[in-house]
């Protein structure tokens, strides 16, 4: 399964805080841990691009600062989300072990706030170094030995996290037949609840070789299985919501790190699962951005 960072227990957190003289009364992590959980609320992040050096600037952006601001926003929500998904490109460039140590360190406040974090891989990640750096935190057993895949069951939907990393620093992605077979079998075994598929890479086309190479094979699996309601991805560093002709929602998450085109928003999405759909609330890091607070209401296909 993808690296799963469980919440840090309240006891662990209090002990760590006391040892570090953290000032419990003012701690946003403790404040978040004391809140009720929104069982249907989820934080959707992509492309955090963290580097070992917290002062590193890329495209005019400090990536560590951006994730820190998102983390603080999550901790200050009226109700804490049930969990956080980070849909690939966790590392800055080539997925070094020290990058993933920084990732683990930066995600600790979220875990202290009692929110589990699910991490998937993108083309700027390195699977082996990822596993090595986070060895103590990951689940002991994965459904596929050499891929980061998971099924996360929740009250109103099942989340399927896939691994589209083909080669580090190679832009396109690939799922491969073994992973597609696992997805098909897992969907068939879980027919009676909406399914949401999370993959780092965007749907690819002949004209767009930078996306998912086996997009058509993926759609051959998910289109006829009517419980699949959405395909959620990052990679393009663009915020966009579209719909496949079959009715599957295509949700392109904004980057937490930097944008490729001036004017695009950086930030995250607060997703709220409803009985027959999902509400998406865009949270821009630049709160003056015209898209900040944009709400998209999705209705599930029948």
Q: Predicted regions span which residues?
A:
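N-terminal export signals
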Residues: 1-7, 12-32
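Short N-terminal helix/helix-N-cap motif within the alpha/beta-hydrolase-1
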Residues: 18, 53, 95-96, 128-129, ...
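N-terminal active-site segment of His-dependent metallophosphoesterases
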Residues: 32-100, 192
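Extended active-site neighborhood of metal-dependent phosphoesterases/phosphodiesterases
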Residues: 34, 96-184, 189, 194, ...
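A short C-terminal boundary segment appended to hydrolase-like catalytic domains
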Residues: 36, 272-302
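Active-site neighborhood of phospho(di)ester-bond hydrolases with catalytic His/Asp-centered motifs
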Residues: 45-46, 84-88, 117-122, 162, ...
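Solvent-exposed loop/turn segments at secondary-structure junctions
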Residues: 48-51, 90-93, 123-127, 165-168, ...
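Short acidic, glycine-rich surface-loop motifs adjacent to enzyme active sites
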Residues: 190-206
């Amino acid at each position: 399964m993808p690296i799963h960072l469980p919440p840090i227990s309240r006891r662990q957190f209090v002990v760590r805080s006391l040892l570090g003289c953290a000032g419990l009364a003012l701690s946003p992590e403790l404040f978040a841990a004391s809140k009720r959980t929104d069982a249907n609320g989820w934080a959707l992040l992509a492309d955090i691009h963290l580097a070992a050096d917290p002062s590193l600037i890329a495209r005019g952006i400090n990536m560590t600062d951006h994730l820190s601001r998102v983390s603080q926003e999550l901790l200050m929500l009226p109700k804490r989300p049930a969990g956080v998904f980070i849909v690939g490109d966790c590392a800055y460039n080539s997925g070094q072990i020290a990058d993933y140590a920084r990732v683990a360190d930066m995600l600790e406040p979220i875990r202290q706030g009692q929110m589990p974090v699910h991490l998937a891989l993108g083309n700027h990640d390195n699977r082996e170094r990822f596993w090595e750096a986070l060895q103590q935190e990951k689940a002991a057993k994965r459904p596929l030995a050499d891929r980061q895949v998971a099924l996360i069951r929740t009250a109103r939907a099942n989340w399927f996290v896939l691994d589209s990393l083909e080669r580090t620093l190679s832009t396109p992605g690939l799922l491969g037949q073994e992973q597609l077979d696992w997805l098909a079998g897992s969907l068939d075994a879980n027919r009676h609840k909406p399914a949401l598929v999370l993959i780092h890479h965007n749907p690819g086309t002949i004209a767009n070789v930078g996306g998912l190479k086996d997009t058509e094979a993926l759609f051959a699996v998910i289109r006829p299985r009517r419980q699949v309601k959405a395909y959620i991805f990052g990679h393009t560093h663009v915020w966009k919501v579209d719909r496949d002709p079959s009715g599957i929602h295509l949700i392109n998450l904004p980057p937490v790190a930097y944008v490729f085109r001036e004017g695009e928003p950086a930030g995250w999405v607060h997703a709220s699962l409803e009985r027959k759909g999902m509400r998406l609330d865009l949270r821009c890091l630049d709160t003056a951005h015209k898209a900040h607070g944009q709400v998209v209401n999705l209705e599930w296909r029948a």
